[in-house]
Swiss-Prot record:
Name used for this protein in its record: Na(+)-translocating NADH-quinone reductase subunit F
Gene it is expressed from: nqrF
SUPFAM superfamilies per the UniProt record, alphabetical: 2Fe-2S ferredoxin-like, Ferredoxin reductase-like, C-terminal NADP-linked domain, Riboflavin synthase domain-like
UniProt GO MF annotations: 2 iron, 2 sulfur cluster binding; electron transfer activity; metal ion binding; oxidoreductase activity, acting on NAD(P)H, quinone or similar compound as acceptor
GO CC annotations, alphabetized: plasma membrane
Reactions catalysed according to its record: a ubiquinone + n Na(+)(in) + NADH + H(+) = a ubiquinol + n Na(+)(out) + NAD(+)
Length: 407
């Protein structure tokens, strides 16, 4: 009898707990459809099942909001304005959204879990963003750790981007071995030295990342990217390698790749001010796009200089392109500084970090650096050093343009 009573009591407790969980779920989780009103326009508004992130909901409706980090909450790009619904702003959003913006309803779409009807506002240019399945034309090393990925846009399609813009690229779930990468012999020494071929990239879900374009608008029918492989830091080799760069480095001619865009804010100002471009590493991409656009498409007569930092001569690329531009345009000069030139380089040019070279060989004796426009893209340490140098010279924020994606 006692055993039967014990079993009955235990069963009763379990049933009560199950009922409590179901009750809580019914109150806390909205499982029905919700309505999302977009810009007060019925044609843009939609209904969708509740419970997903707003960024994903918009994407499923063909509305592609920029998200360089792929929805991780770290880039702060997927801003929307929520007029109704959405709940309270989350701590993860406050590093990107100030109090004034939060009061106006600004939110990060990747952080908003949709549980109720929403009224949102989006910039009109977002509705010009599209998605394409492209074909890989080529994927070649331009430096030891940088590939140039060239994609063919589908016939009859056009990506209406501006110089300095970027696209988002999708990496599917994958299991990629670095041993399968196509790395030319001239670059394999460093790969072997750091034992990089031992790595694998194993990912179980689709990932999205942003890359600045290296081509300019008159180079039609293609998208060209400069992609640096993101390997684990030497002191922490157990950190997983970069998801997207691993995927891109594995691509071969003929492969299909999904992109969306165009996006961007790193655009040239329409003024007559002198333009000074500063780049390093894969930050070459938007530099090339801007400079080619200014000189080849716009036929700009503005004074333009380009200062690029590389480790050694083997890490330099597009030299012939920029040499030709310099020969054809008297208003353009470009300069390279090597931080670690090798004996075989026989280098007689500038050495050291590019911000120091720029300061000592140009800006220190410039009559008015504060009147110039500075466009930069490179590794974080380079960007920080350049910005500090410019601030010390009295350059205002409005004349310092930074692309955080290309480096």
């Amino acid at each position: 009898m006692e055993i039967i009573l014990g079993v009955a009591m235990f069963t009763g407790i379990v049933m009560v707990l199950v009922l409590l969980i179901l009750f809580a779920k019914s109150r806390l989780v909205n499982t029905g459809d919700i309505a999302v009103e977009v810009n007060g326009d019925l044609d843009k508004s939609f209904t969708a099942p509740a419970g997903d992130k707003l960024l994903n909901m918009l994407s499923s409706q063909g509305i592609f909001v920029s998200s360089a980090c792929g929805g991780g909450g770290s880039c702060g790009q997927c801003r929307v304005v929520i007029k109704e619904g959405g709940g309270d702003i989350l701590p993860t959003e406050l590093s990107h959204i100030n109090k004034r913006e939060a009061k106006e309803g600004c939110r990060l779409a990747c952080q908003v879990n949709v549980k109720q009807n929403l009224k949102i506002e989006l910039p009109e240019e977002i509705f010009g963003v599209k998605k394409w399945e492209c074909e890989v034309i080529s994927n070649d090393n331009k430096a030891t750790f940088i590939k140039e990925l060239k994609l063919k846009i589908p016939d009859g399609e056009d990506v209406p981007f501006r110089a300095g813009g970027f696209i988002q690229i999708e990496a599917p779930a994958h299991d990629i071995s670095y041993a399968d990468f196509d790395v030319p012999d001239e670059y394999r020494g460093d790969w072997d030295k750091f034992n990089l071929f031992r790595y694998r990239s194993v990912v179980n879900e689709t990932t999205v990342r942003a890359y600045s374009m290296a081509n300019y608008p008159d180079e039609k029918g293609i998208i060209m990217l400069n992609v640096r492989i993101a390997t684990p830091p030497p002191r922490d080799p157990d950190v997983p390698p970069g998801i997207m760069s691993s995927y891109i480095w594995s691509l071969k001619a003929g492969d299909k790749v999904t992109i969306s865009g165009p996006f961007g804010e790193f655009f040239a100002k329409d003024t007559d001010a002198e333009m000074i471009f500063i780049g390093g590493g894969a930050g070459m991409a938007p530099m090339r796009s801007h400079i080619f656009d200014q000189l080849n498409r716009l036929k700009s007569k503005r004074k333009i200089t380009f200062w690029y930092g590389a480790r050694s001569l083997r890490e330099m690329f597009y030299e012939e392109d920029f040499n030709q531009l310099q020969a054809e345009n008297e208003n353009f000069t470009w300069h390279v500084a090597l931080s670690d030139p090798q004996p075989e380089d026989n280098w007689t040019g500038y050495t050291g970090f590019i911000h120091n070279v720029l300061l000592e060989n140009y800006l220190r004796n410039h009559p008015a650096p504060e009147d110039c426009e500075f466009y930069m893209c490179g590794p974080p340490m380079m960007n920080a050093a350049v910005i500090k140098m410019l601030k010390d010279l009295g350059v205002e924020d409005e004349n310092i343009m930074l692309d955080d994606f290309g480096g």
